[in-house]
Amino acid sequence: MRIDMTGEPGDPRHPNEDYASAALPSSGEGGALVVLDGVTPPRDGTGCVHGVPWFTARLGGALLELATAQRDLTLGSCLSEAISRTAAAHCSTCDLSHSRTPQATVVAARWDEERVEHLVLSDSVLLLEHPDGPVTPVLDSRLGELPPHIRALRSRVRALPEGGAGRRAARAEYVRAVEALRNNPDGTGFYTAAADPAVARHAVTGTTPRSEVSALLALSDGASRWSEMFRLGDWAALLALVRKEGTGSLVARVREAERADPHGTAHPRGKAHDDASAVFAELGPQAPAGEASDG
């Protein structure tokens, strides 16, 4: 078993709004990992006195603890309970009904000698490496499947000069349109973990036999830029890079690509530099039936 993780803020002057962690129970039976990507708050506030880093630390910590200690619960149930616990921790001081109350994307995975469970909510990514080499991405694609009128707004933003008043106004209009799709109770749009535990039922979940998974890699979208935005390689190449050079090297290469295109001319994006987090778990050979893993 090998765990490697890196988390780095997009701007060193501001705290990282991601959360990344992993746990290996002392029993030696499997493990779990969690990566959250906190949604950057709007300038006009969120109704919360704590902030996004506090929220992701509370939610991520609760989810990891539940996934590790409550193995009888599904990951969806663990996420639902973690959201409830986090909401209870600040419902007396904050307006959790605010549309932009702190929220985050979620990746979680849990494994033992028999199976690997996964959960993905919104645009963070989980990669499953199989023993014979192929890599399967687990994606929640709903944020990328925007309606045509919103895609048109996005194209309009990208066509306007960087830094101009026209671009700022167009971007504000685009952001409002996207936000109107977030956590819609009617089942349309896309979902992030905020204060409503019911959102957990919208997560992409599944189970894979342990014998079919040799490694896992969880990525916030700041780290998955290497493949999704900068097109430096496919998912298999990304995981191979991490296996060979580590998660720190992946983030460093993303930073190089960001610096090479500081104004988003070649690769239009909302942030020149984004928080980037990655957790890699190399599971190692599966223990023979009837034998406990040594972790």
Roles of regions detected by a PLM:
Residues 1-295:
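PP2C/PPM-type serine/threonine phosphatase catalytic domain
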